[in-house]
């Protein structure tokens, strides 16, 4: 799925100003100021912070490409040591991105929103669009009192991952740069900043107010106050966070409530860089998709810095309000987040402008062709997922419309599809015991696993799509369903045909925490929390549920997930139950809407696989689950 190579050739001779440069395909110069090493991990308790680690090394370097590549590649990850690159990896294809790009699905029909401390600087060459492009970039001016609305280097690196264009003007229609392409290079991208102050001493830390956070999220979720003609975003990325692991602060409640009331707008948030520390908000929210970071040779190794601590659950109806500490997994998915080369903004604003020690980085005019190296953090894992969602919705727009099939665009469906299509990461463990029962559902660092867009697309488009109601809903080998279940109810799903051989199986169930947003007060409120469970059964010869082979039964999470590396041949089914409510302040919640998605992969017998390998041609391709 990805290439790995050693960088050929020496660096070019140093320029007179001390910088080393290399001509890329005779049309592209890259340079990087690398003088100071700074590694930041978790958040300062007093401040919000973008969730990243940055390394700025102590020399100048040029980024090199591999000889013979066609240029239609992606963001790089690589190890840079002692003045040379040890290796480079093209990151986007690891997640199945290239199939979308080569098929012409590059996000052109979608809008991505990015909300964090500062704004994206769209003056970098990574954001140059081809002549005649009908999509582009815009900045939302935060109207909250004290909002700085400043350009920031961190937002610019995140924007590169989301929708870097990579277009280089030139003869014959130009070309795409190796370093420029983001996940959705033709999507519209709108940026908003929430900071009212940047720290002078702690790089990346910033302060906010309730209004400075809530107003841009309200605008993006509801599609108000954006650039003329710009539709509300299909997905919002949040690469920042701080505190509130119970997701009950004013900001967190508002974001979660807006996500529930506007389900066609997916919200993706970075999990944090605290290692074993608790996942913080907005990623700790219930109605978002929280993303952890991956590294390693195949990007299946959980990053050591990626936050994995269990989040809290606050029950407002219990004893006047009770906080249950460390009772739920907050991470939903994982994506690459290590050693990335990303667009550099070196202007006198945002985090760098406020810093008391990094003034030497500031350049005027701001160079348009420089890249930060060795960028780590869940801040970058999240936009890989957000950009991936834009690609899925771009394809969806060629199949359905939001009006004709609104459930297909629902965040609960998108989240379940991505989980069902996720690949097992190294050391993945969701607490399934010998009887395949789990009260945890997800792995603490990577959730359901590594995002795999190819498998997700198979689940989303190729299988069942919103199954008709019946006594038992009939399923093919992959697909999704959305339904509304009454309190105390149980809905059954059965595979149309039996598995003829051992089969790998993923199944994901998601629903929303009931939180409501008040447009008059700009606040969110906690209303109710439903407790659904997910069971997997083997059927008997008459098609009846005979023996339960697994169950995901969390108490304080709104996700259930099961992974079977192999179930024996036979016919199977799922059962979704709505057993109880953890609380209901309204005393009016009698049903809950959910999304279910699943994926199966037949496992060939060793003898059959041996014959294929022995012939010298591997004809079988196992879908990654």
Model-derived regions, located:
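Bacterial N-terminal signal peptides
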Residues: 54-63
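Subtilisin-like serine protease catalytic core
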Residues: 69-209, 229-235, 245-248, 261-264, ...
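Active-site neighborhood of phospho(di)ester-bond hydrolases with catalytic His/Asp-centered motifs
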Residues: 237-239, 267-272, 291
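Exoplasmic/lumenal beta-rich domain surfaces
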Residues: 342, 349-356, 530-569
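C-terminal edge strands of extracellular/lumenal beta-sandwich accessory domains
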Residues: 410, 415, 493-495, 524-528, ...
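A short, hydrophobic C-terminal helix/tail in secreted or cell-surface proteins
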Residues: 605-621
């Amino acid at each position: 799925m990805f290439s790995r190579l050693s960088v050929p050739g020496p660096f070019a001779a140093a320029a007179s100003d001390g910088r080393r440069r290399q001509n890329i395909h005779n049309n592209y110069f890259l340079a990087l100021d690398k003088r100071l090493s700074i590694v930041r991990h978790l958040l300062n308790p007093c401040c919000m912070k973008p969730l990243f680690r940055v390394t700025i090394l102590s020399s100048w370097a040029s980024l090199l490409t591999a000889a013979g590549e066609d240029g239609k590649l992606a963001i790089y990850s690589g190890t840079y040591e002692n003045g040379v690159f040890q290796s480079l990896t093209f990151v986007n294809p690891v997640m199945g991105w290239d199939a979308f790009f080569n098929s012409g699905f590059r996000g052109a029909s979608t809008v991505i929103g990015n909300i964090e401390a500062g704004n994206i600087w769209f003056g970098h060459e990574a954001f140059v669009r081809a002549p005649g492009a009908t999509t582009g970039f815009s900045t939302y001016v935060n109207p909250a009192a004290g909002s700085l609305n400043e350009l920031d280097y961190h937002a610019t690196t995140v924007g590169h991952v989301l929708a870097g264009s990579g277009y280089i003007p030139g003869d014959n229609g130009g070309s795409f740069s190796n370093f420029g392409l983001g996940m959705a290079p033709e999507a519209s991208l709108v940026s908003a900043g929430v900071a009212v102050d940047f720290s002078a001493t702690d790089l990346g830390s910033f302060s906010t107010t309730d209004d400075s956070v809530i107003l841009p999220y309200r605008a993006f979720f509801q599609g108000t106050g954006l650039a003329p003609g710009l539709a509300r975003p299909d997905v919002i990325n949040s690469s920042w966070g701080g505190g509130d692991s119970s997701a009950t602060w004013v900001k967190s409640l508002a974001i979660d409530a807006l996500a529930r009331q506007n389900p066609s707008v997916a919200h993706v948030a970075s999990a944090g860089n605290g290692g074993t520390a608790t996942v913080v908000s907005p990623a700790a929210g219930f109605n978002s998709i929280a993303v952890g970071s991956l590294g390693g040779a195949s990007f299946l190794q959980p990053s050591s810095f990626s936050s994995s601590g269990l989040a809290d659950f606050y029950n407002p109806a219990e004893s006047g309000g009770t906080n249950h500490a460390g009772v739920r997994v907050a991470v939903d998915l994982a994506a690459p987040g290590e050693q990335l080369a990303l667009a550099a903004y070196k202007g006198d604003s945002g985090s760098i402008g406020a810093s008391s020690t990094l003034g030497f980085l500031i350049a005027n005019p701001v160079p348009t062709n420089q890249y930060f190296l060795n960028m780590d953090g869940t801040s970058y894992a999240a936009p890989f997922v957000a950009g991936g969602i834009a690609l899925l919705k771009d394809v969806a727009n060629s199949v359905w419309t939001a009006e004709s099939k609104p459930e297909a665009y629902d965040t609960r469906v998108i989240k379940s599809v991505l989980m069902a299509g996720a690949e097992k990461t190294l050391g993945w463990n969701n607490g399934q015991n010998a009887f395949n029962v789990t009260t945890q559902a997800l792995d603490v660092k990577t959730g359901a696993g590594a995002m795999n867009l190819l498998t997700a697309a198979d689940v989303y488009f190729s299988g069942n799509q919103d199954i008709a109601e019946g006594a038992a809903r009939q399923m093919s080998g992959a697909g999704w369903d959305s339904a509304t279940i009454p309190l105390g109810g149980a809905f059954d799903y059965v595979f149309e045909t039996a598995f003829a051989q051992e089969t790998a199986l993923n199944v994901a169930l998601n629903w929303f925490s009931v939180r409501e947003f008040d447009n008059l007060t700009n606040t969110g409120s906690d209303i109710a929390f439903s407790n659904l469970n997910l069971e997997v059964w083997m059927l008997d010869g008459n098609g009846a549920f005979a023996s339960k082979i697994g169950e995901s039964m969390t108490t304080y999470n709104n996700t259930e997930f099961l992974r079977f590396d192999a179930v024996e041949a036979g016919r199977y089914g799922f059962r979704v139950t709505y057993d109880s409510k953890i609380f209901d302040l309204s005393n009016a919640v009698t049903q809950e809407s959910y999304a279910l998605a699943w994926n199966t992969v037949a496992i060939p017998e060793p003898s059959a696989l041996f014959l294929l390998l022995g012939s010298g041609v591997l004809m079988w391709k196992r879908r990654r689950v």
